[in-house]
Amino acid sequence: MEILLYAVGIILMAIAIAVSIALHEVGHLVPAKLFNVRVPQYMIGFGKTVFSFRRGETEYGFKAIPLGGYISMIGMYPPSPAEVKEHHEEGHSGSTSPFASLAEEARAADAERLQPGDEDRLFYKLPVLKRMVIMLGGPTMNLLIGVVCTAVLICGFGTAQVTNKVSAVSECVPSVSVTHDSISYGECTDKSTPSPAKAAGVQVGDRVVAVNGASTGSWEAVSSAIRAAGSRPSTLTVERNGQRLDLSVTPVEMIRPVSDGKGQYARAADGSIATTRGGFVGVSPSSELVPGSITEVPAMVGDTLSRVGSSMLSLPQRVWELTVTLVTGGERSAESPVSVVGVSRIAGEVTATDRIDVKAKAAMLVSLVANMNLMLFAFNLIPLLPLDGGHVLGAVWEGVRRFFARLTGRKDPGPFDPVKLLPLTYVVAGAFIVMSIILIVADIVKPITLF
């Protein structure tokens, strides 16, 4: 049954990824057709076509490698400058450099798709703003999916809120090991000292209502009171089976990670996990999904995008560190990036675990889809070709050049020519392919696990 549930999670996430890719391309397709650009193909995946059908002038289909998608629009590349044409007309062979050959081949391939009547349906002839709308349509769809999934998560399932109910009682006082990126606790042995909570008789299911007579309205208040007590004897007041009991505990002072209040570890100035010394009792809180308001959605989306942005800035470094980990056999950081394979494995782990109920599993899957789409939104806005952000930047650059040309009375500089950046485009695309291979291999041989 566990294997079946694991497979269900992978299949569900694969469907979610495919739908996200498909809607991303719809975001490009719809405005392109509205602006009368001919779109010969709408494809999900890359490589050999597995299945396709034609409706109107567009072929819709699926390809063998489901790692993305695309729409092809005619007129992506403007013709060569007039002076180059004149140069060829004079009988010269033109540049024989590899880059020039690439440019000529790209223009030739683009020109081969032209049909009679396409003269006014070319992408590069559109006004700058319309081209920007087309290229931003895909990322905008991912943003909308992320916002909708976040709204479903907050208003439908609710977000995890820590309660005062005890979910676990430590058997012993563990040893603590803190590294730059992780914190681990030693295993209990026969020689380990029983935890203060275990010695005091605290049980799973107890609700902590007061510490040393002071009411605790939140688990943060419980933790603060225990940390403040240090190693001094304290009284925990708990509710158990409708009755209140006073339990005497003596906290043990030990190193503790500092929480950022959002379920993550706070960070020190050097980026390491921040720690402090405080009292340890040995109880862990439970969490419940508490539905929120639609007004909470913008803040959560903004927070997610902020974290995605910070993560993207350090992406090259983290991919390099992951590569070193793969080569040296070290331990993979839980904060390392993952591929679609890793996301699917995490989804399978969520559906297969018996540690959370069905509602919590569904909420985690929706959260995965939301975060994935918000990441795709931000990633596609990187201002490098062949990403959407690169095309947007090119359109903006064209608009700026033409504006200043009109302002100064100079000749129109013409449309932005992405062919001139083909070498850079291939380098960027190659880097993305290498990164994807590294992440996929890591997700297979050193997967991140949640449970």
Q: Where do the model's predicted regions map?
A:
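PDZ-domain C-terminal substructure recognizer with occasional recognition of PDZ-binding tails
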Residues: 203, 209-210, 221-276
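Conserved PDZ fold ligand-binding element
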Residues: 189-219
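Hydrophobic alpha-helical transmembrane segments and immediately flanking/interface helices
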Residues: 79-95, 162, 335-350, 437-451
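Small-residue-rich helix-interface/hinge motifs
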Residues: 4-114, 118, 372, 376-406
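Internal alpha-helical transmembrane segments
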Residues: 34, 69, 76, 92-178, ...
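Terminal peptide-recognition signature
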Residues: 24, 62, 197, 205-208, ...
